[in-house]
């Protein structure tokens, strides 16, 4: 299953990142930053339609979507079109994402950014904050209940939102 491959690839990547820059350092840096105040709940409760636009270079099913990838220009166009938030893929192996996209976009737009990755470790949340994210995606099917609760609390502590993805597998009778 592709999700299992994505999680394993992420696990290997995060372990390397933690060897390069330990959790303690990343956590301290993130906690020293100004708390954010973006709330997905507030955005989706507005009377007008809100939309999240996505910055994605590739996908496992389609491969590379665009060789030429002016992600900053795309983000500026999304903001100009009225996007409420921009989702930035940072998963490098299957989606060809990069944390530099998140960081550089955060310096060029004023709307909130969602780090879209397969968050499996608290390290990734602190790292998302450092790279300019206002929100992270938490996927229930790859996290246990205690991890999910802990990660939501970390987001709260950092002034970030947690967008929790849950799906129910249903088979008809």
Give short role names for the model-derived ranges.
Residues 98-114, 151-163:
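Alpha-helix-loop-beta-strand connector modules within alpha/beta enzyme cores
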């Amino acid at each position: 299953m592709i999700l299992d491959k994505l999680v394993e690839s992420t696990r290997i990547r995060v372990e390397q990142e933690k060897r390069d820059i330990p959790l303690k350092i990343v956590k301290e840096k993130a906690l020293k930053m100004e708390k954010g105040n973006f709330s997905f709940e507030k955005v989706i409760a507005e009377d007008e339609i809100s939309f999240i636009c996505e910055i994605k270079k590739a996908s496992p099913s389609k491969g590379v979507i665009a060789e030429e990838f002016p992600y900053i220009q795309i983000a500026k166009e999304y903001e100009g079109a009225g996007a409420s938030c921009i989702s930035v893929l940072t998963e490098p192996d299957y989606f060809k994402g990069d944390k530099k996209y998140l960081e550089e976009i955060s310096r060029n737009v004023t709307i909130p950014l969602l780090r879209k990755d397969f968050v499996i470790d608290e390290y990734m949340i602190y790292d998302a904050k450092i790279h300019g994210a206002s929100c992270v995606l938490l996927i229930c099917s790859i996290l246990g209940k205690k991890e999910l609760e802990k990660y939501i609390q970390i987001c709260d502590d950092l002034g970030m939102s947690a967008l929790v993805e849950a799906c129910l597998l249903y088979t008809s009778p």
